[in-house]
């Protein structure tokens, strides 16, 4: 089995959107349009298994201090290979290289992120611009049932 992590190009967006569609439809991941993904393509890391896109995530920078793991997804048939863990670890490494101080995650998978060293925080600690830029677009807003977690770099 050949596993490859790489930075995508805009040509990968269609396949990435196909992969995340089910999670977007059920409200576990926020919809990102093709243009939004193209605009932030440098923030994504993709993993391929035997030449097929198996998962991806993005490290979105909110400020000189705070970044966020976004849109973490691994295809069901590739789960159990620790690809999600490796994608988040890639975000952590990138955050350190960029000199950031903290990585935020809004998640339904508390145990997964705790195992990677993230700590739960109260949602009122999330910067207001994050709420108005992203959360307001969520189908669950304003009754967010995600767990806010941070990793100190």
Positions of predicted regions on the chain:
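A short beta-loop-alpha structural element at the N-terminal edge
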Residues: 2-16
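A generic "binding-loop/recognition-motif" signal
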Residues: 12, 65, 108-109
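Hydrophobic pocket/interface hotspot
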Residues: 16-17, 113
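Helix-loop element at the rim of GNAT/NAT acetyltransferase active sites that forms part
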Residues: 18-31
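A conserved beta-strand-loop-helix scaffold within acyl/acetyltransferase catalytic domains
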Residues: 31-50, 55-66, 70-73
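Conserved acetyl-CoA-binding loop-helix of GNAT-fold acetyltransferases
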Residues: 74, 80-95, 105
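Conserved active-site alpha-helix within GNAT-family acetyltransferase domains
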Residues: 107-134
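C-terminal "cap" of GNAT-fold acetyltransferases
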Residues: 126-153
